[in-house]
Amino acid sequence: MAKKHNAPAKPALEPNEALFQAVSLCRKAGALTMGFDAVEDAVVKGKAWLVMTASDASPKTVQRLNYAVGDMVDVIPMPLTQDKLADISRKPVAIYAVTDRNLAKLCFCLLYTSPS
């Protein structure tokens, strides 16, 4: 007879924490481009699947980004601040692009399940 393992269920992550971990995973996988110019270049070259902005990004930066790449790829605001995201990027960055299709899909799904 097989032995049953009654391990306690892992608690679910908060949506913002799950998104933070997904962005961190993108960085570790080498599928995260950071900074306005690098993101714009990745989008123009067709490498970016998703573009995300920090919640405290400058409105002018977001406007410039939408004007430059808004018709080529989705630009979605994240509920995470630049200070929180600095733990991933080592410096405050407002604009991120995901260059892997499956990781972009993961981040996209988490963006729409997290409270904004």
Language-model regions, residue ranges each:
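Short basic, glycine-rich beta-strand/loop surfaces that mediate nucleic-acid
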Residues: 72-111
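N-terminal first-folded block
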Residues: 17-50
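Positively charged, polar, low-complexity stretches
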Residues: 28-29, 36-42, 55, 60-85
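Conserved beta-strand segments of the P-loop GTPase G domain that flank and frequently precede/overlap
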Residues: 52-54, 97
